[in-house]
């Protein structure tokens, strides 16, 4: 019988590696990622499991790309470095990063899946929502020189961050944090949601 990646990942979680590493490898399974895409990202909501799996790019990075400035966009357009760091601040590493493609629409979405043990700001020392905004912002700003060059900002790709929080209540929920424009003064000058739908 042919074993799936998920079956191998579950077997590999024998206590030799840390809880954090185990969760990352389980989350990186294509079937698990397809399920996450369907239930957490609007663009994939009407897809079957097979359709969603077909949208997942070939490279799934596990704990390999940093979120901090200066490191997240290393490499070429197909670069896979997943680290970002600022001197004296340590390095923030994305748990699972991959690209998802809506092929018929020609859309590429950069996806980050994070396993978060605690959401308690007292334990973390910060509010988790602020870290989420930081990671999403870095996924946008790190696209320069990897997804586009010079001032070709129309080639920015959408980014999505899915944070799976382990300390939630039994019912669970999905909350969306995004960038929403709103007119404060004057006439509408034609900003369309689809032109600014990056987060």
Regions found by a protein language model. Give the residues of each.
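Elongated, amphipathic alpha-helical interaction scaffolds
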Residues: 1-199
């Amino acid at each position: 019988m042919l074993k799936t990646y998920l079956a191998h990942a579950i077997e590999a979680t024998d206590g030799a590696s840390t809880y954090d590493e185990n969760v990352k490898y389980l989350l990186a399974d294509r079937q698990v990622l397809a399920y996450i895409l369907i239930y957490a990202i609007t663009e994939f909501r009407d897809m079957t499991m097979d359709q969603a799996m077909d949208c997942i790019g070939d490279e799934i990075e596990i704990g390999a790309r940093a979120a901090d400035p200066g490191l997240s966009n290393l490499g070429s357009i197909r670069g896979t470095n997943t680290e970002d760091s600022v001197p004296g601040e340590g390095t923030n590493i994305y748990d699972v990063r991959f690209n998802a493609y809506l092929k018929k629409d020609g859309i590429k979405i950069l996806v980050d899946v994070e396993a978060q043990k605690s959401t308690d700001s007292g334990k973390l020392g910060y509010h988790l929502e602020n870290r989420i905004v930081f990671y999403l912002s870095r996924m946008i700003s790190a696209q320069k020189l990897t997804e586009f060059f010079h001032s070709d900002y129309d080639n920015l790709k959408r980014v999505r961050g899915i944070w799976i929080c382990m300390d939630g209540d039994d019912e669970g929920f999905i909350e969306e944090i995004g960038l929403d424009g709103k007119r404060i003064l004057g006439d509408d000058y034609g900003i369309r949601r689809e032109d600014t739908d990056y987060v």
